């Protein structure tokens, strides 16, 4: 896809701060530090539109980015390893659930899992939750460049089995730009 414009629009700490639903939205979800922000930057061919960090839990709000004035990319806070108080973690969970459950313009959820590990219980729980609410979901295995060539298919098969997928997850590496087009082709159902 040709990107003509990509801009940060708004951060939301509560549902009443979400933009008025008007154009399709694609949400990016996954555990803390799995590469959500990196994937968004890669898809948009930008280095710093979405802030990335090696520190888990950096994204603490729901961030909306308008793409080509046609749709939003929505960067959700990560779950799992963030070193935050449990009350903050529960607040994030309620915020994410409210967004995923109620957002009428949500067209797809990109669930990003770390290709180096089997999916976590939280990855499985989110996938089950999305299936229950009949939300379209696209599974992307991140950090594929961190695996040896011989490990890639084994890890992808494990992710497919653990998440009960019909098809193999798409691969992403911030170092290899060739895989972006395949992800783009699957973003808008």
Protein language model annotation of sequence segments:
Residues 43-47, 100, 163, 187:
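Hydrophobic aliphatic residues
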Residues 68-107:
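Conserved nucleotide-sensing/catalytic segment adjacent to the nucleotide-binding pocket
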Residues 89-93, 120, 177-180:
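Amphipathic alpha-helical transducer elements in NTP-driven molecular machines
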Residues 94-167:
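Conserved C-terminal guanine-recognition region of P-loop GTPase G domains, centered on the G4
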């Amino acid at each position: 896809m040709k990107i003509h414009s990509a801009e940060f629009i708004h951060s939301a700490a509560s549902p009443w701060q979400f933009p008025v639903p008007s154009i399709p939205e694609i949400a990016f979800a996954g555990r803390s530090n799995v590469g959500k922000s990196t994937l968004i930057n890669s898809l948009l061919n930008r280095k710093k539109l979405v802030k990335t960090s090696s520190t888990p839990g950096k994204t603490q709000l729901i961030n909306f980015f308008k793409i080509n004035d046609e749709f939003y990319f929505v960067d959700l806070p990560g779950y799992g390893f963030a070193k935050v108080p449990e009350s903050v973690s529960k607040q994030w969970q309620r915020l994410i659930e409210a967004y995923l459950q109620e957002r009428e313009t949500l067209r797809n959820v990109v669930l990003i899992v770390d290709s180096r590990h089997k999916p976590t219980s939280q990855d499985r729980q989110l996938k089950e939750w999305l299936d229950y609410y009949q939300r379209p979901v696209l599974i992307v295995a991140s950090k594929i460049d961190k695996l040896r060539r011989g490990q890639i298919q084994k890890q992808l098969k494990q992710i497919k089995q653990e998440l009960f997928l019909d098809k193999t997850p798409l691969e992403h590496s911030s170092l290899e730009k060739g895989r972006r087009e395949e992800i783009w082709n699957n973003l808008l159902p």
